[in-house]
């Protein structure tokens, strides 16, 4: 009788463990929800039906500008840390400019990167940099993984700050303007089906 109870108890524990494990796996596999709709100029599905978002990161950093000889600010490059949207506060990557190509790069903690070219620009509102849709040009696997390799599109959404100040500047000066935004990484239908 004790043996039967012990076996039943062990089976119950295994079943519950399996259910708990399944619940955790399901939670971890929850898909990223698109913040835009097909037809929206910032939505990749407008140009490539079947695309889906697979990663959403929050960025905080600066947009750097250099003052030109004519006394106006010219955008130089972004420098930002990337964070998951779960509120843990741990950086998982970085965002910067490839000075050779002039294109923005996102690098995940596994070393994988995506470099993209701007396709659509929409005003981010007064005092904010623009919202963007960028198309991947080059992706590379990192030494520790390939999280960003399947990226075909990158959205820059919900921008705050980052705009150069109004008015004249002293030639040769530089300025770093704080900004934050969300970057959403999209994969094509073909790479979505490969998973």
Walk through the language-model features, giving the residues of each.
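Secretory targeting and sorting signals
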Residues: 2-28
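Primary mode marks residue(s) on the alpha4-beta5-alpha5 output face of response regulator receiver
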Residues: 28-64, 71-195
């Amino acid at each position: 009788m004790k043996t039967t109870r012990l076996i039943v108890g062990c089976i119950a524990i295994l079943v519950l463990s399996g259910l708990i494990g399944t619940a955790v796996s399901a939670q971890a596999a929850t898909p990223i929800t698109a913040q835009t709709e097909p037809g929206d100029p910032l939505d990749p599905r407008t140009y490539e039906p079947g695309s889906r978002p697979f990663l959403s990161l929050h960025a905080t950093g600066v947009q750097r500008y250099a003052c030109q000889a004519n006394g106006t600010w010219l955008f130089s490059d972004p420098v930002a840390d990337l964070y998951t949207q779960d509120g843990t506060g741990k950086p998982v990557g970085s965002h910067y400019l490839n000075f050779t190509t002039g294109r923005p790069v996102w690098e995940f903690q596994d070393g994988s990167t995506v470099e993209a070219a701007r396709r659509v620009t929409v005003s981010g509102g007064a005092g904010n940099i623009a919202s963007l849709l960028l198309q991947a040009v080059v992706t590379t696997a990192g030494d520790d993984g390939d999280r960003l390799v399947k990226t075909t599109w990158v959205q820059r959404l919900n921008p705050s700050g980052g705009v150069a100040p109004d008015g004249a500047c002293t030639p040769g000066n530089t300025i770093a303007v704080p900004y934050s935004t969300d970057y959403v990484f999209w994969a094509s239908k073909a790479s979505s089906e490969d998973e």
